[in-house]
Amino acid sequence: MTTVLAIETSCDETAVAIVNNRKVCSSIVTSQIPVHQQYGGVVPEVASRQHLETINVAIAQALEQAQLDWGQIDAIAATCAPGLLGALLVGLTAAKTLAMVHNKPFLGVHHLEGHIYATYLSESSLNPPFLSLLVSGGHTSLIFVKDCGNYETLGQTRDDAAGEAFDKVARLLKLGYPGGPVIDKLAQQGNPQAFALPEGKVSLPGGGFHRYDASFSGLKTAVLRLVQQLEKDGEQVPVADVAASFQETVARSLTKRAIACALDYGLDTIAIGGGVAANSGLRKNLQAAAVKHNLRVLFPPLKFCTDNAAMIGCAAADHLSHGHTSPLTLGVESRLALTQVMKLYHPLE
């Protein structure tokens, strides 16, 4: 059994957790949303300063909540890519310092790999191979999970990520930031069939459309034109109906691609990860389609859909069990493909 203290500071949450394989011993998340709301989005410099102010307290709280001391911690981990460079540096520097002071193995973890492992925290039976649908503010991808650190990207968005589209539509509807939760809540009061919005498709060079790639920029533009036309006609914009129609279109698009991909590759399990995994419309669509096609669809608990350190610790524990650790010279990267995750590690000596 491996006990890992993990740190996640890739964006606007300062998170520290202690994980014993797939069991969460403690999980501390300090959100910066109230700080960034006044700006309408995350300000990188502000995020970094907030992480600096809260990281030490979060580490102490994680140890206290787990009722553990440093002698009971087997390894230290932190997100190192992708993300905001300044924010990542805060967590990575803290983790490497702790690893040196306490003479513990250190592991850098890919943020998206963490989101894949979020489902492991509640599903003890989940093991590769399976299909992962990663949907967040910065990424939308279909990943063939073959083994720990062994991934193949089968599909992705060609423009806006799903979560990014939610934020942009929320902004044009004047709903505030972050957009995902507020649109989801408002959609409960609206009619998802009120407006026929276009489902973005990605054309293939030889004709036809890509079965797994998605596009959301056209959908976002369609919502903008719809709102502009309603206002031009002097009509009140039915915000709940627009939100519901938009959410349904996104959920239908993601579901169609995930199901097709799983069936084509003979995978009977789809695990969802990322902040948009909390969306009720996506959950409803995927669960219904999974039953129809005799597939298993798994979602993380809501508290582990958004950024957290428990998922980072779970990924680190699995890597450590495979003999992987990271050099203390490891740096941060704003962009790093999930398929390159093994560059973060070297074999245990």
Curated annotation (Swiss-Prot):
GO terms for molecular function: iron ion binding; N(6)-L-threonylcarbamoyladenine synthase activity. GO terms for biological process: tRNA threonylcarbamoyladenosine modification. Its cofactor is Fe(2+). Fe cation binds at residues 111, 115, 307. InterPro entries: ATPase_NBD (IPR043129), Gcp-like_dom (IPR000905), KAE1/TsaD (IPR017861), Peptidase_M22_CS (IPR017860), TsaD (IPR022450). It is found in: Cytoplasm. Keywords: Acyltransferase, Cytoplasm, Iron, Metal-binding, Transferase, tRNA processing. The keyword Calcium does not apply. Pfam families: TsaD (PF00814). It is an enzyme of class 2 (transferase). PROSITE patterns: GLYCOPROTEASE (PS01016). Gene3D superfamilies: 3.30.420.40. Binds 1 Fe(2+) ion per subunit. Substrate binds at residues 134-138, 167, 180, 184, 279. It comes from the Bacteria. GO terms for cellular component: cytoplasm. It catalyses: L-threonylcarbamoyladenylate + adenosine(37) in tRNA = N(6)-L-threonylcarbamoyladenosine(37) in tRNA + AMP + H(+). The keyword Transferase applies. Required for the formation of a threonylcarbamoyl group on adenosine at position 37 (t(6)A37) in tRNAs that read codons beginning with adenine. Is involved in the transfer of the threonylcarbamoyl moiety of threonylcarbamoyl-AMP (TC-AMP) to the N6 group of A37, together with TsaE and TsaB. TsaD likely plays a direct catalytic role in this reaction. HAMAP family: TsaD (MF_01445). NCBIfam families: gcp_kae1 (TIGR00329), T6A_TsaD_YgjD (TIGR03723). Belongs to the KAE1 / TsaD family. This is tRNA N6-adenosine threonylcarbamoyltransferase. It comes from Nostoc punctiforme (strain ATCC 29133 / PCC 73102).
